[in-house]
C-alpha cells in the first residue's frame, strides 16, 4: 500500500461501519461512524488541495428530477457505469483506489485489470448492502434518457468534461 490519504481512510471505515450496521442496525458506534464520515466527506475537508469530480452527482440529480428516487438511490444506480466510463481518464486514481481501499493485489495485472477489480469489489459491496444497481429500478425508461442528459449540469475540472453523448452512454449502461 501507498500511504493512505484521508479520503481512502474514510471509504475503508465506511465500508467496515456499513457492514456492521447492516448486520446490527442498532449498533450506535457503526452508525455514528457513518455519520461522522459523511460529515467529513460532504464538507469537502478530505478534498482540500485535490481535483474533485462531482459529475456523477449532477447525473444523479437529473435522474431524481424524473423519478421519486432519493439522491443516494440515483448515485448507487449510476456510479459504477460512470466510473467504468471514466476509468481510462483516471486510471492511476482508480488503480490506487483498488489497492488502497479494496486490498486488490496488483502483482501480475495491468493497471486496467487492477482498477477494474477494484470496481468489481465495489459492485459486490453495493449488492451486499442491497443498494439500487440500475436506473430501471428507479422507473427510468429509454424515452427519459435525452431529457435526463439535457438536465445534467456539466461541470469542469474532473477527469473528463462530459458531452451530451457521453451522458447518454453512461445512462444507457446504467439501465
Please give the residue ranges for each predicted region:
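Single conserved hydrophobic/aromatic residue that forms the stacking wall/gate
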Residues: 1-6, 10-11
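Oxyanion-binding "anion nests"
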Residues: 14-52, 59
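Short amphipathic alpha-helical interaction patches enriched in hydrophobic/aromatic residues
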Residues: 18-22, 42-46, 63, 67, ...
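Short, solvent-exposed positions on alpha-helices
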Residues: 28-32, 73, 133, 143
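C-terminal catalytic subdomain
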Residues: 51-117, 123
Amino acid at each position: 500500500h501507498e500511504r493512505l490519504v484521508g479520503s481512502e481512510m474514510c471509504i475503508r471505515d465506511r465500508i467496515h461501519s456499513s457492514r456492521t450496521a447492516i448486520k446490527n442496525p442498532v449498533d450506535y458506534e457503526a452508525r455514528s461512524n457513518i455519520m461522522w464520515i459523511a460529515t467529513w466527506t460532504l464538507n469537502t475537508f478530505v478534498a482540500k488541495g485535490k481535483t474533485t469530480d462531482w459529475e456523477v452527482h449532477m447525473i444523479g440529480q437529473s435522474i431524481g428530477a424524473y423519478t421519486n428516487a432519493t439522491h443516494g438511490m440515483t448515485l448507487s444506480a449510476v456510479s459504477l457505469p460512470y466510473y467504468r466510463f471514466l476509468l481510462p481518464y483516471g486510471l492511476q486514481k482508480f488503480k490506487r483506489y483498488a489497492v488502497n481501499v479494496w486490498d486488490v493485489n496488483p502483482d501480475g495485472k495491468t493497471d486496467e485489470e487492477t482498477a477494474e477489480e477494484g470496481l468489481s469489489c465495489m459492485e459486490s459491496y453495493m449488492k451486499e448492502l442491497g443498494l439500487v444497481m440500475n436506473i430501471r429500478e428507479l422507473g427510468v425508461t429509454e424515452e427519459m434518457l435525452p431529457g435526463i442528459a439535457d438536465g445534467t449540469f456539466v461541470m469542469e475540472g474532473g477527469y473528463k468534461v462530459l458531452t451530451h453523448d457521453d451522458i447518454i452512454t453512461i445512462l444507457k449502461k446504467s439501465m
